[in-house]
C-alpha cells in the first residue's frame, strides 16, 4: 500500500521503508530509502499509482484513490478503480485552453474506463502464462505488455527499476476490461466461476475509427477472455482455465462514417495486407498455439467484401496452424433460432477437444495440463455475434470440466445445475456489455440470449434502442473518445505548439447544423402554436421551415464526411484533411483505401 504526500516542491510516494520523490518543477523521479518509520497503513491517504502523463505544458500525476473489490480468485483480491485524482506538477492548467481540453480528455478516459488491478497477482497474464513465466523476471518486466494499460504512464518509474529494483513495488499494472467472480455449492463442493477480459492497448479505440490491422499486425478491438473454474472441497482444490480471443478481421479495411446508417466500406487487397496479417498470426501462434479462426460476418450485402477479404488473406498465408471456419450467423440463427449456434460447436468440437484447457493443482501449484491453441472469433465489430459464440464455447468447456469432476453426469447439461448456470449466464452477459461499452459506447446487443438462453422480443427492442444510440455516439461523439485513447496510451504526445480547439471547416459547413436546428424549432413552434400573429400565415411558415429542414438534411447527408466528429489528435489512416480556399475539408485517402477492392 502506497502513501501519498505533496508540498509545493515535491510529491512523495512512501511504501514501508522506501520512498519515491518527484520534483514538481523538473519532473525528475528519484528513489531513496525512507529514514522515517514505516508509514501506518491508513486507508485515508493510501493510493495506487497509475502513472504520470505530459500534456501540452504540464505533467500530471495520476493516482487511483477509490476502489472496490471486484473479485477474489485463488486467494488474490482484485479491485476495480472508481476514482482517480489527476494532480498537476506546476499548476499551469488555467493558463492555456488547449491544456484544459487535453486535461478533460484525460479525465473522461479515467472516469469511463473499467480499470482493474491486484496487489498480489499480475492481471495482464493468463493463469497458464503466469505459471510458465513464474520466477523468470520481476513481476513488472514479466507482465504482458499488450494488456498493461498504464505502461506508457508508468514509463518514468519503470526506467528506474534497473538501478533500484524496489521501484517495482510502487508500480501496479492495470488492465482495461472486465473481471468478476461468483461461487456456489454443488454436491458439497464449492465451485467458483470467474471471468477476466483483457483489452489490448495496441490499436485501441472506438468502433468506426479503429478497424482491421495496423502495419505491425495489431488488430482493433482485440480482447483476451479467460474463464477460470475452481472446484474445491475439504481435501483438494483444482483450477481450470480456458482462454478465447477476439479481434477485428486481420486486414486493411474500414467503415467510413458519412452519416448513413451503414458507413462506406473501404478495403485494400489481400496482397497488401498479407505481411501485416502474417505478423499478427505469427504472434498469436507463438503465444497461444494453433488458431481456430471463427468468422461470423455475413456472406452477402454490406459485409460480403470483408468476408471475401478475410478468406483471401487466409489463403495467401496458407499456414497449417490456422484452421478457418465460417459460420453465417444471421442466416443460420434467423427468426430467433439462436440454439442453432450448436451447428458451429459441432463443427469445431474436435479442435476444442484437441486444444483442451489449463488444469492446475492449486494446493501444490502444479500444472497438470495446458491449453494448446485458442479460438479466435470475430464478426464486424467483434461484439454482439462474437459474444454469443464465445459464451456458447465457454458453456461447452465448463460443461466438460464439470463432467470430468463428477459434478454432473456425462449426458447432463450445465442447465441441470441451476445456481451455477445462472452465474454463468450473468457473468458472460455482463462481460459482453463491458466490452461493447468500451468500443461502441453502448451495451451489447443480443444479451437476452446470453443471459436467459432464449431470444425475446423485448431483447430485440432493446437492441433497436442500443443500435440507435450507437449511431448517434459513433457519428457525433466518438472523436473525443478516440482522442482520449490516443492521449492516455501515448499514441499522440502534444507539444507546446499544439492546437486542439481550432475548427477550420468552411463557414457553410459550420452553419448548416444551426440552420437545421432553427428550422426545426420554428417548425414545431408554428405547428403547436395557437397564435396566428406572425408575419407569414402559419401554413406558409410550416411549408418554408419544412423545406429548410429537408434542404439542410440533404446537404448534411450529401457532405456527410464534414459533419462527423472526427478525432482531432490523430486522424484515421483512411482519412486526410485538405486546406481549400474556403477552409479545411475531410476526404477519404484513396491511396490507402479503394472501395470494395478485395
From Swiss-Prot:
Name of the top EC class for this enzyme: hydrolase
Membrane topology summary: Multi-pass membrane protein
Cellular component GO terms, alphabetical: cell cortex; endoplasmic reticulum; endoplasmic reticulum membrane; Golgi membrane; mitochondrial outer membrane; serine palmitoyltransferase complex
MF GO annotations: phosphatidylinositol-4-phosphate phosphatase activity
Domain of life, per lineage: Eukaryota
Chief subcellular location: endoplasmic reticulum
Protein source organism: Schizosaccharomyces pombe (strain 972 / ATCC 24843)
The protein, known as: Uncharacterized protein C19F5.03
Domain SAC, residue spans: 106-441
